[in-house]
């Protein structure tokens, strides 16, 4: 083997390594792992031969450092008490698609080399930050009950489900224009504003977001909304969601009572015509007014006209303004 081939072989081996460190002080002496890989794997730091195919197996530790060699595509070291992993390095597992590391003692997680990752479950750890800017393939994220202060998932354009509830210090959440269908931010007590640009959102849970003042999920497909325990909520934008009467009534019932303070704004859109919208909503505007909320209803024909205007702006006016701007430079 010449030097070039040796270097390539060494690089390939390095890229197919996962390293983890277990806390000796709290370890049970066992390590639970589930591994799926292309080809064979080896595991250093355990007594038993490796199991693949996703089988969740209890290994006996022979070292606090465990090294997995092989082309791993799915790695599960998640647990609820059995593992005590304090460090996890997956930066050389470039073909990793699924990572389940929940229920450990991780304080950091580097995913900058894991562009192939589609599923991440890192909940119940001690992470204070999570950089997902390189995880462009992510579809499902569960980061419940860690210690995030901010979360930016705008790079995750394929995101379908996001669960980030019980991050009590989370003050900023940036979401992508993705096929997101479910969003859970329950009990994120410092979150003040939430904007969800997804057009496919069906489920929104903001229960217990005590500081939340504004939520914007207009033009989505919402059919389940949970807003209990949001005393500071003042602006709700669900224009274009076409909520039915039953869900609209539940929404109004769950809104906080704003009597004695600035009136709340509830923006709703119905797929029916303006005259029919009044019948569908029934007495909801009055019920909302009793709690000092104003309901703004945008009829379908007006919404369609606004969309046509926006389309004209995008296709005709904006390119013209850009050309004029370049001409004056």
Describe each model-derived feature in a short phrase.
Residues 154:
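C-terminal polymerase-core module
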Residues 1-98, 115, 136, 157, ...:
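N-terminal capping/linker segments that flank leucine-rich repeat
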Residues 40-43, 133, 150, 182, ...:
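Low-complexity, intrinsically disordered short peptide segments enriched in small/polar/basic residues
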């Amino acid at each position: 083997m010449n030097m070039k081939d040796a270097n390539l072989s060494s690089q390939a081996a390095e890229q197919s390594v996962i390293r983890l460190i277990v806390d000796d002080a709290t370890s049970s002496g066992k390590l639970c792992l589930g591994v799926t890989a292309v080809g064979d794997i080896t595991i250093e730091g355990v007594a038993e031969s490796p199991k693949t195919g996703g089988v969740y197996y209890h290994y006996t530790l022979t070292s606090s450092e465990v090294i997995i060699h092989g082309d791993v595509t799915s790695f599960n070291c998640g647990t609820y008490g059995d593992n005590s992993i304090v460090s996890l390095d997956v930066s050389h597992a470039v073909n990793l698609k699924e990572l389940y590391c929940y229920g450990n003692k991780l304080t950091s997680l580097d995913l900058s080399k894991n562009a192939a990752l589609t599923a991440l479950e890192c909940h119940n750890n001690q992470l204070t930050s999570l950089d997902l800017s390189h995880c462009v393939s992510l579809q499902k994220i569960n980061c419940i009950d860690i210690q995030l202060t901010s979360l930016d998932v705008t790079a995750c354009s394929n995101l379908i489900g996001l669960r980030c509830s019980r991050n009590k210090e989370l003050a900023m959440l940036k979401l992508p224009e993705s096929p997101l269908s479910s969003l859970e931010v329950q009990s994120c007590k410092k979150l003040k504003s939430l904007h969800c640009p997804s057009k496919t959102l069906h489920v929104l849970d903001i229960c217990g977001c005590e500081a939340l003042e504004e939520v914007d999920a207009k033009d989505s497909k919402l059919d389940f909304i949970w807003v209990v325990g949001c005393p500071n909520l003042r602006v709700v934008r669900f224009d274009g969601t076409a909520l039915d009467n039953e869900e609209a009534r539940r929404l109004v019932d769950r809104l906080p009572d704003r009597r004695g303070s600035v009136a709340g704004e509830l923006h709703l859109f119905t797929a029916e015509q303006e005259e029919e919208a009044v019948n569908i909503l029934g007495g909801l505007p009055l019920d909302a007014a009793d709690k000092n909320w104003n309901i703004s209803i945008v009829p379908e024909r007006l919404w369609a006209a606004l969309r046509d205007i926006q389309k004209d702006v995008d296709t005709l006016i904006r390119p013209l303004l850009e050309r004029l701007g370049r001409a004056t430079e």
